[in-house]
Amino acid sequence: MAHVSVPMYWRTIPQRYRLVGSKCKKCGSVNFPPKGVCKYCNASSEFDDVQLSGRGKVHTFVLISAGGAPPEFAEQEKAGGQYPVAIVQLEEGPKVIGQMADADPKEVKIDMAVTTELRKIYTEEGVIRYGFKFVPARK
């Protein structure tokens, strides 16, 4: 089972719960999750926090089937069978990975408009871990 230490878990709450990224003061690119050095210009370590919209489009995706998920997702796998995991290009630029929810795996498509919602990700040692999942955008 994957283990995330309590201090690391608490440090990443702004990214996991509120989609807070960092905007490079030199090149203006948005990094998510925030980095110590800009991953685009590699020259700046000065950033401003930026609230990401949570809106984007599916860049690519994969369907996770039985046996393909880490142990902490076994309960979800048993309950629902296959589930999609997508790399989404957010409106602000960064690409982020996350599970899809409320979407028939057969209907997930490249360029599909999605938004983020705070959802239960998994339970580890009796602690429920929350984070964002992507859902189809409402029209």
Name each model-derived stretch.
Residues 23-26, 37-43:
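Short, cysteine/histidine-rich loop/knuckle motifs that typically chelate Zn2+
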